[in-house]
Each structure stands twice: as structure tokens, then as C-alpha cells.
């Protein structure tokens, strides 16, 4: 399945627009990982565990996005954007939210 952050595909014709597709991935935070991430932040290091979570989340969100586009009969998704955020659930933690959006299309 073709995926692109642009709204055109060079050398290809968009034969049909199927509509907007979205996908969401949500991860719970881990208190121990948060503790060590906080220490790394204080000393200026990178928080590799969170980087890995976001990388995994991006991959999973794109995979879900293309799966939903296929269900609409599309063979591509254009204008793909991935955003991240947090949802505070209480004073003990938060949820990490990764969303992907795009337009499902059929390209020739």
C-alpha cells in the first residue's frame, strides 16, 4: 500500500478519493520507566525507552491507517500526518496518544 505525506503522487494519477482515514494508538505509562526518564531529563540524556515507544506507535498507527484504507477499497493513503500527545488520567500517570490521519485513495 502506498503511503505519502504529500497530497499528490508524482507520476501517478489519483483515480478515486475514498475519504479521510484515521487511526489511534494509546499506550499507558509505566511508573518505573517514567522515573528513569525523569533522571535522564535532569542530566540531559535522551529517554530511549520513550523514543522506542513513539517509534513503535508511529509504525502501528500507520499500519492501522493503511488497514482501514484497504477496507474502503483504497490502494494508497496520501497527506499522511502523525501526531502525538498525552492524556492525563490522574496524578499517578498519563496515556500516550499517537494519531495518524490521511486521505484514502486509489491510484493508477
Swiss-Prot record:
The signal peptide here is none
| Disulphide linkage map | none
Q: Which Pfam families match?
A: YbjQ_1 (PF01906)
Family indicated by similarity: Belongs to the UPF0145 family.
State the protein's name.
UPF0145 protein sll118
To which species is this protein native? Synechocystis sp. (strain ATCC 27184 / PCC 6803 / Kazusa)
